[in-house]
Swiss-Prot record:
This is Bifunctional protein HldE. GO terms for cellular component: cytosol. One of its GO terms (biological process) is ADP-L-glycero-beta-D-manno-heptose biosynthetic process. Keywords: ATP-binding, Carbohydrate metabolism, Kinase, Multifunctional enzyme, Nucleotide-binding, Nucleotidyltransferase, Transferase. Residues 1-318 are annotated as: Ribokinase. It comes from Aliivibrio fischeri (strain MJ11). In the N-terminal section; belongs to the carbohydrate kinase PfkB family. Pathway: Nucleotide-sugar biosynthesis; ADP-L-glycero-beta-D-manno-heptose biosynthesis; ADP-L-glycero-beta-D-manno-heptose from D-glycero-beta-D-manno-heptose 7-phosphate: step 1/4; Nucleotide-sugar biosynthesis; ADP-L-glycero-beta-D-manno-heptose biosynthesis; ADP-L-glycero-beta-D-manno-heptose from D-glycero-beta-D-manno-heptose 7-phosphate: step 3/4.
Length: 476
């Protein structure tokens, strides 16, 4: 199955669970302490990242979705740091602050890519009244299309069964990242995402694929789930649904550097995709592609729609299509090594029309490979004003990537692509319209590197503004 990227701007997910703050202190080590036989780390870098349920919310927000996060924190500095970080990422935080408990914090001391020690600051939340967290959930349910319950056995989901029932009352699907062998407490959930170890803890050792399916179906029936998504490391994922054939999704990871937070990414992409209207099988395929990206990164990591789009294009596209900046620079180097002439252009391409297609075909004829750099949503808004773009970045790029003339599509967030062009340095930079060569962003850098800059004519009578005005005026 090759899924298509949904518009995550339309997704809205409520995340309830164990939130935590991950702190990293890193630096070089060059000596052993005279006080004890331990290395001395000269701390040069300090990082803070949301963890647990907060990482799920951060993943959804990174895709462009609306993430509403409910959890338990203390009344302390880590809670303030966590809230500040999440709100800067456009996550709506609705925490229950409990002064008698500390905010769960994990401090890792790192050196030369290795973790030397982890210090946990926590006291699992226990005997916490249900009302504060349930009432926050009830208030949020009317404005979301999916619920994620992220369980790290720290106490936020002590009343998980009540939470499931609240979501079921309003027909909102509930996705759970489980913890422990007691699946009874999750009875009635839409879907659970156990990894293979968690699955076998409940059902016993799995002998083969048939045994996995049989035991999974038994779990679904016994606990009134609609589905299970079993994540299986190098064997990919298996989606099991009531009275349906299993769906086996092979792993898409090319290299595995760190599996930290991969489960959070899986459930966040799954829930966000379902909340946009994607069917469960396609949402799982998107989650599988996302997992293949994040395990190639160090630490808890999010991914962007650009990276996800690139992942679902897959290797069959031979590295072409939607691509990130680093991958583009590498691809251009390879093209030059093959003796190919690289042409580059840029624009908003908000509503693709015949003039655009003609222009891009002409540009492609001038070389062997054509790069189209596309303004992101924020960049278009600054240039064009309120109400633009009509189509979000991922959709504009998807349309451009589908044109035969275009080899690579890459986004840029600045007002002009000057920085990007100066990194890529194409053989030929083209721009449509009546620009003077010296006014074209990036032109000076291309010429200084021995390249060319050309201005191409647009087809008369075609413009995005004209199309928008015609639609507003009701003209065909």
């Amino acid at each position: 199955m090759k899924p298509t990227l949904p518009n995550y701007d339309q997704s809205s997910v409520l995340i309830v669970g164990d939130v935590m703050l991950d702190r990293y202190w890193g630096g070089p080590t060059s000596r052993i302490s005279p006080e004890a036989p331990v290395p001395v780390v000269k701390v040069e870098k300090i990082e803070e990242r949301p963890g647990g349920a907060a990482n799920v919310a951060m993943n959804i927000a990174a895709l462009g979705g609306d993430a509403h996060l409910v959890g338990l924190v203390g009344e302390d500095e880590p809670a303030q740091a966590l809230t500040t970080t999440l709100e800067s990422l456009k996550v709506h935080c609705d925490f229950v602050a409990l002064p008698e408990f500390p905010t769960i914090t994990k401090l890792r001391v790192m050196s030369r890519g290795q973790q030397l020690i982890r210090l946990d600051f926590e006291d699992s939340f226990h005997d916490v009244a249900a009302e504060p967290i349930i009432s926050r959930m009830q208030q949020a349910l009317s404005s979301v299309k999916a619920v994620v319950l992220s369980d790290y056995a720290k106490g936020a989901l002590e009343h998980v069964q009540s939470m499931i029932q609240e979501a079921r009352k309003v027909n909102v699907p509930v996705f759970i990242d489980p913890k422990g062998a007691d699946f009874e407490r999750y009875r009635g959930a839409t879907l659970l995402t156990p990894n293979m170890l968690e699955f076998e803890t409940v059902v016993g050792k799995v002998k083969d694929e048939d045994d996995l399916v049989a035991k999974g179906q038994q779990i679904i029936e016994e606990f009134d789930f609609e589905a299970l998504l079993v994540t299986r490391s190098e064997h990919g994922m298996t989606l099991l649904r009531r009275n349906m054939e299993p769906l086996h999704l092979p792993t898409q990871a090319r290299e595995v550097f760190d599996v930290t937070g991969a489960g959070d990414t899986v459930i966040s992409v799954l829930a966000a995709s379902v909340s946009t209207g994607k069917p469960l099988d396609e949402a799982c395929a998107l989650a599988n592609a996302a997992a293949g990206v994040v395990v190639g990164k160090l630490g808890t990591s999010t991914l962007s729609t650009i990276e996800l789009a690139e992942a679902i294009h897959g290797s069959q596209d031979s590295g072409f299509g939607i691509i990130g900046e680093e991958q583009l620079i590498s691809a251009v180097k390879q093209a030059r090594a093959r003796g190919e002439k690289v042409v580059m252009t840029n624009g908003c391409f908000d509503i693709l029309h015949a003039g655009h297609v003609s222009y891009l075909n002409h540009a492609a004829e001038l070389g062997d490979r054509l790069i189209v750099a596309v303004n992101t949503n924020e960049s278009v808004q600054r240039l064009k004003g309120p109400g633009r773009p009509i189509n979000p970045t991922d959709r504009r790029m998807a349309v451009l990537a589908g044109l035969g003339a275009v080899d690579w599509v890459v986004p840029f967030s600045e007002d002009t692509p000057q920085r990007l062009i100066s990194q890529v340095l194409p053989s030929l930079l083209v721009k449509g319209g009546d620009y003077a060569i010296e006014d074209i962003a990036g032109g000076a850098e291309v010429i200084a590197a021995g390249g060319e800059v050309k201005v191409l004519n647009f087809e008369d009578g075609c413009s995005t503004t004209g199309i928008i005005e015609a639609i507003k005026g009701g003209r065909g």
